[in-house]
Regions:
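Short beta-strand immediately N-terminal to the Walker A/P-loop
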Residues: 35-36, 85
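Conserved ABC transporter NBD signature motif
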Residues: 61-68, 81, 114-119
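Helix-to-loop junction immediately C-terminal to a conserved catalytic motif
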Residues: 53
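Conserved structural motif at the start of ABC-family nucleotide-binding domains
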Residues: 7-9, 22
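ABC-type ATPase nucleotide-binding domains, specifically the catalytic core motifs of the NBD
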Residues: 17, 35, 73, 98-117, ...
Length: 134
């Protein structure tokens, strides 16, 4: 099995115009960990996710994933590495069931066995999703 390195945001700073939203944020997420961002409206949760996924460019700091510098990469490159986010509140694919939504995350993966393994892992981590898959 491959050994993966953490996702690290180090000294991350993001601003919209003159308004600083993230100021020297440091987050390290190790393989296998589940991490939750909590905060009030305007705390920077969405901005942080947008920076991780390449949708918003930080003006300082770095983002590394699996030992590679990904700061400033275009979103499609970051998605191809396995990092993405779908905002639940937007109901992006409302007609799809849970499993169909999860399989959307594997649209670039061609190895059917790998897709099945990843889906099984998600269901092991989140049994409620398995109960509601169809």
């Amino acid at each position: 099995m491959a050994t993966f390195k953490p996702l690290i945001a180090d000294s991350l700073c993001v601003a919209y115009g003159k308004a600083d939203v993230l100021n020297s944020v440091h987050v390290e997420i190790n393989p296998g960990e589940i991490t939750c961002l909590l905060g009030s409206n305007g705390a920077g949760k969405t901005t942080f996710i947008r920076a991780l996924t390449g949708l918003t460019k930080p003006h300082a700091g770095t983002i590394q994933f699996d030992g590679l510098e990904i700061t400033g990469l275009p979103p499609h490159r970051i998605v191809s590495m396995g990092i993405s986010c779908i905002p639940e509140g937007r109901r992006v694919f409302p007609a799809m069931n849970v499993e169909e939504n999860l399989l959307m995350g594997a649209y670039q993966e061609r190895d059917r066995n790998r897709i099945r393994e990843r889906l099984a892992r998600v269901y092991d981590l989140f049994p409620r999703l398995k109960e509601r898959r169809t």
